[in-house]
């Protein structure tokens, strides 16, 4: 499937909200949930504006992964951009109907190519120990696992094991 990454903007709010609602249960199988409030359009709209502000301030850079028709099939982001140290953290999620098509792999390749334009020279990532698909995407894109730790999820209170990865550009 041909995809491209498109920088998040105001006009994407409705389509992104629908994408998040449609994939909520699927996402919550492998990553901590975002809480019920996130799935109210009012709250979502506020959060969307906060993300755009972060992006304006160059703290983060958010992208929608779209297919050739412009349909949102996933998200990929660089957050906690540190221009002094050249570091950022990557996160991504692919909609349920679009998994196992190589989309996360291709989107991460595209993001890695544009990261130097944001003065990022090292990308860090973390994923839960049971998210094998994400681990494979990271390794396939040249990330190395650098540590493992356990954290308590703020939303669910459950103990999760995280694998931490890094890639120098």
Give a label for each model feature.
Residues 125-135:
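Conserved beta-strand-loop-alpha-helix junction that forms the acyl-donor binding cleft
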Residues 126, 144-161:
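Conserved catalytic-core motifs of GNAT/GCN5-like acyltransferases
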């Amino acid at each position: 499937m041909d995809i491209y990454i498109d920088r998040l903007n105001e006009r994407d709010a409705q389509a992104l909200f629908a994408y998040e609602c449609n994939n909520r249960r699927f996402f919550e199988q492998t990553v901590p949930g975002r809480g019920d409030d996130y799935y109210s359009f009012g709250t979502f709209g506020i959060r969307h504006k906060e993300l755009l502000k972060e992006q304006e301030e160059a703290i983060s850079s958010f992208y929608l992964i779209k297919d050739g028709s412009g349909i949102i099939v996933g998200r990929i982001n660089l957050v906690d951009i540190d221009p002094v140290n050249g570091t950022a953290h990557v996160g991504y999620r692919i909609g349920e109907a679009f998994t196992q098509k190589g989309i996360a792999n291709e989107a991460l390749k595209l993001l890695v190519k544009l990261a130097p334009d944001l003065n990022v020279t090292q990308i860090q990532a973390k994923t839960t120990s049971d998210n094998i698909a994400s681990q494979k995407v990271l390794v396939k894109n040249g990330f190395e696992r650098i540590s493992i730790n356990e954290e308590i999820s703020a939303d669910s209170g459950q103990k999760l094991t995280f694998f931490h990865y890094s890639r120098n550009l």
